[in-house]
Amino acid sequence: EHIKILLESASYAPSHFNSQPWRFVLIRDKARREHLGRIAGYSMREVMTKGNFWKRYLKYFRFSKEEMDKAGDGIHIDNMPSVLKPFIKYLFSEKGVEMMNKLRVPYILAIDSKKLVSRSPLILGVLLTKDEYKKDEHSGMYSLLSLGMAIENIWLSATALGIGVQFISLPMEAGGAYWQACIDLVQPPENYELVALFRLGYIDPNAKRPTIDWSSTQRKPVSEFCYEETFGNKWIPNCDCYFT
């Protein structure tokens, strides 16, 4: 079974003292997935309506392939209703929040978010043990690094199996009652903390894209983020002398 393959791949991730601080909760029940979908939808509407999301992440929004090629990072908003296209740069700006609300963009995004989460056959709850995940101690950072590697193992294995993975971030962005509702759904014991939620499902190449959607395939060249010996000393590619 593919789920077993994904979880076993996570188990092979390195962790400090082989502590394996992660735990995973599989949510497959239709009613529970739909409940989480509603939480995701309401969270999306809340965050987008207030506009804080745009202020925080606007620097990563790109509106053309040329912008993506130049920046090498961010997300390219490349799918939206034609009626919105003339206003796109204004809408996705700090000043455009009011117009965005008038055009009901947060509601469009909320409906799409609800559908995406509800229709995903598997939701993965990711937890860390509080015995190791202590935010004011080194073990807290070690635990997060270990968990990141475990999730990466899952992601790579999923990709090889034709399974898509997406982080369900909006309930956490909205915080408060929205994130608490997710915690209540997962029901972690006192000594475990819910850290993240992901949705998984087999990729359908013919599936209709969300009403407003983006792509993020662009990457910076290695020379832009790698340095030699000290930060700022540009690394020169094609020098493998240290491996000979």
Locate the predicted segments by residue.
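Acidic, surface-exposed loops and disordered segments
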Residues: 1-244
